[in-house]
Design a protein with these regions (language model features):
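One-carbon transfer enzymes
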Residues: 1-167
Length: 167
């Protein structure tokens, strides 16, 4: 199993979701901390300003479907663009390409009656469910399978959020 840490950000809800999934024992580090001894760093809200670390895999959660809508205010960009499907992307952060290989994506529909706050809330819900499960697959050296989203399998009494135990 890979040793990983979360890089702190203002996105406390996703940090809490990751901690909950893994039983609350995952280190939360600051950008200036030493990353020695970690195989994986999990970003929780950084844009392309985060610099890759030698010999450490880095992943990020992006609140739209890449490769569309990169940079600042991507949620607003996606919502105002008129797209009917947006979503969440989990991607690798690579040395010369912050938006590296896409590891997983999950759609969020934007209907005619969807307002911006509902859209943002749905993006956050999907991110809190998808990201911990992708992290779990990476640290256990398995390929992420979307069926995992619908089956129990996390560390809290064997459930991934589909029952009353994880509410």
């Amino acid at each position: 199993m890979k040793n990983f840490a979360i890089i702190d950000s203002e996105n406390k809800e996703i940090i809490t979701a990751i901690q909950k999934h893994f039983g609350g024992n995952i280190p939360v580090l600051s950008v200036g901390d030493s990353f020695e001894g970690y195989d994986l760093l999990v970003l929780t809200g950084y844009e392309s300003s985060f610099q890759p670390v030698e010999n450490v895999e880095i992943i990020n959660l992006h609140p739209t479907l890449l490769p569309s809508f990169q940079g600042a205010d991507v949620l607003k960009q996606a919502f105002l663009s008129g797209v009917k499907v947006s979503g969440i992307t989990v991607h690798k952060v690579e040395k010369n390409n912050f938006y590296g290989k896409i590891l997983a994506q999950y759609p969020v529909l934007i209907g005619a009656a969807t307002n911006f706050s509902d859209y943002v809330e749905e993006i956050e819900i999907v991110g809190k469910k998808l990201y911990p499960m992708v992290i779990d697959s990476i640290i256990n050296d398995r390929v992420f399978d979307f069926h995992d989203l619908f089956n129990c399998g996390c560390s809290k009494n064997g459930c991934s959020g589909n029952c009353g135990n994880c509410s």
